[in-house]
Amino acid sequence: WFSFIREAYQGAEDMWRAYSDMKEANWRDSDKYFHARGNYDAAKRGPGGVWAAEVISDAREGIQSLMGRGHEDSMADQEANRWGRSGNDPNHYRPAGLPDKY
């Protein structure tokens, strides 16, 4: 039980780091990459990380949907979220030219 909580906390940190990096990079067409990367990193923590990534991703997309963001873009974000959470390489979504720092 304690390991699940630790994994969830660390997974939430991974999600925040990906979000912060996305804002810092401010790189065109990079949002799907950062969605996939945050979910990928969180899921590597274990079941708690997977849970945290799913809850955070669903909440974020739900809020953005309420704010009038397009359904198609939200669905594409969720696909990138699932891709990363499933352990697939987030670089699949990496845009050309994004600095190696990310």
From Swiss-Prot:
Record's note on what induces expression: Upon cytokine stimulation.
Signal sequence, renumbered to the chain: none
Keyword Secreted among UniProt keywords: yes
Pfam families reported for this sequence: SAA
Keyword Secreted: yes
Region named Disordered: 68-102
Annotated tissue distribution: Expressed by the liver; secreted in plasma.
Subcellular location: Secreted
GO biological process per UniProt: acute-phase response
Gene3D superfamilies per UniProt: Serum amyloid A protein
Compositionally biased spans, kind Basic and acidic residues: 69-82
A single GO cellular-component term on record: high-density lipoprotein particle
Alphabetical list of PANTHER family matching this protein: SERUM AMYLOID A (PTHR23424), SERUM AMYLOID A PROTEIN (PTHR23424:SF29)
Disorder: Reactive, secondary amyloidosis is characterized by the extracellular accumulation in various tissues of the SAA protein. These deposits are highly insoluble and resistant to proteolysis; they disrupt tissue structure and compromise function.
Biological function: Major acute phase reactant. Apolipoprotein of the HDL complex.
Family: Belongs to the SAA family.
Protein name: Serum amyloid A-5 protein
Species assigned in the record: Mesocricetus auratus (Golden hamster)
